[in-house]
């Protein structure tokens, strides 16, 4: 399986827009880069951010819906903890798996939210949840091992598997199914080479949230396949807006805890994307191996960021509640505005802070740059004609869609939707 297409970047020296994959090929031609890495695409959201920043520097006004980054400031008490760490000289190396204080705070949070108990030797801390996922795959995959991923998926999952010589096995969760994996599809995808199932609920990019019944159906399959481990990416756990609260596989089926890695972090819930703290909780032997991997890459997470993360988990949680309420209002706004635009439709996501909008009604239309044949063409049309930046659905493994992040100011949503509506009206009239 080839990973989804990347977004867009720039050719070196020429400055003209090009697919990020073409950029990657241009800069690695005749280089020392190994064959495995040549399969890997740059992150589409990061590539899009580069283009958006360049366009803004050139004076273009862009409504940016590409990055999943809360626009709020890190809560003051968390930032103060980081400042206090600096002032107090807490600026040295820590253990590769994180400070005991932070790991105790993580254990307390997991017991409170999931009802699951983890010892300090079952928890490790890294430079963001992405590093935790990467370390788990590095520590566990043998060449050719298979990892099941549900499309639409977070863009990094397949490439991280490939980077570690595994094979991504993509199973589509269609829109008619709420963009979710069902038990029958999971059962059919499992082979003797299957090593992991990656679950992400709430989901990036679709906002899908698995109900307890849906999670139960998946865990019943997994119980029958003891070789298959579960990587449960729960970074968006607080962001649930509907009747269904977040549920983890270890809550539904505690027997799976012995082969489940819970992944979470500080970036989303506490507006700490730049602090770079994520964590994993799971069986001690896996955690030890992951910590060894990270000790040979980053040595340890930032001591300053760890102090702030501990304050976040142990302190007042009202900022999280307030953020969720703000994002729910933004979700309602962007869904209403998108569904009012001809050729675009979207369901209301139950979680995270993304809308995965269906743009099938725009495919085949002719814009100023030619026919819109793919959702990548649609995303480029939005950028060039409306100054609206989104990520194409092909990058997430399922077309014809585009992803909007609503982790941005209400005014940006309103302005972006106004410009998008005008551009699409002109397209439909052409």
Give the ranges of each region predicted by the language model.
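Aromatic (phenylalanine/tyrosine) cluster motif
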Residues: 8-11, 23-24
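A glycine-/small-polar-enriched, mobile loop at the entrance of the PLP active site in fold-type I
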Residues: 63-69, 84-103
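Conserved N-terminal alpha-helix of the aminotransferase class I/II PLP-enzyme fold
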Residues: 93-126
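Extreme N-terminal basic, low-complexity initiation segments
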Residues: 2-7
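PLP-dependent class I/II
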Residues: 23-33, 37, 41-64, 68-85, ...
């Amino acid at each position: 399986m080839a990973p989804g297409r990347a977004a867009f970047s720039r050719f070196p020296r020429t400055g003209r827009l090009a697919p990020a994959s073409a950029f990657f090929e241009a800069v690695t031609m005749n280089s020392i880069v190994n064959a495995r890495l040549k399969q890997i695409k740059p992150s589409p959201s990061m590539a899009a951010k580069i283009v958006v920043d360049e366009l803004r520097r050139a004076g273009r006004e862009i409504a940016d819906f590409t990055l999943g980054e809360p626009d709020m400031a890190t809560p003051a008490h968390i930032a103060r903890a980081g400042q206090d760490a600096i002032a107090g000289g807490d600026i040295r190396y820590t253990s590769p798996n994180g400070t005991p204080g932070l790991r105790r705070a993580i254990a307390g949070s997991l017991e409170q939210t999931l009802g699951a108990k983890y010892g300090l030797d079952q928890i490790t801390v890294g430079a963001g949840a992405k590093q935790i996922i990467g370390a788990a795959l590095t520590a566990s995959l043998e060449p050719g091992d298979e990892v099941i991923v549900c499309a639409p998926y977070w863009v990094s999952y397949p490439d991280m598997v490939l980077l570690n010589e595994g094979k991504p096995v993509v199973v589509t969760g269609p829109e008619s199914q709420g963009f979710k994996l069902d038990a029958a599809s999971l059962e059919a995808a499992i082979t003797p080479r299957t090593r992991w199932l990656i679950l992400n609920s709430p989901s990036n990019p679709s906002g899908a949230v698995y109900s307890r019944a849906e999670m139960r159906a998946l865990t019943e399959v997994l119980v029958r396949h003891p070789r298959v481990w579960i990587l449960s990416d729960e970074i968006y756990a607080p962001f649930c807006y509907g009747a269904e609260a977040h549920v983890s596989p270890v809550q539904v089926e505690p027997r799976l805890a012995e082969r489940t890695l819970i992944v979470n972090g500080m970036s989303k819930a506490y507006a700490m994307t730049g602090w770079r703290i994520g964590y994993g909780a799971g069986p001690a032997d896996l955690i030890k191996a992951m910590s060894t991997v990270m000790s040979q890459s980053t040595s340890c997470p930032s001591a300053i960021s760890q102090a702030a993360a501990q304050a976040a988990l142990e302190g007042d949680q009202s900022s999280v509640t307030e953020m969720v309420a703000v994002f729910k209002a933004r979700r309602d706004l962007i869904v209403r505005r998108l569904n009012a635009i001809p050729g675009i439709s979207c369901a209301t996501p139950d979680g995270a802070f993304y809308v995965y909008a269906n743009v099938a009604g725009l495919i085949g239309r002719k814009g100023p740059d030619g026919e819109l044949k793919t959702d990548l063409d649609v995303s480029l049309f939005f950028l060039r004609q409306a100054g609206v930046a989104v990520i194409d659905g092909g990058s997430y493994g399922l077309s014809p869609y585009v992803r909007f992040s609503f982790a941005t100011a209400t005014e940006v949503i309103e302005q972006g939707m106004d410009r998008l509506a005008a551009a699409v009206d002109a397209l439909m009239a052409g």
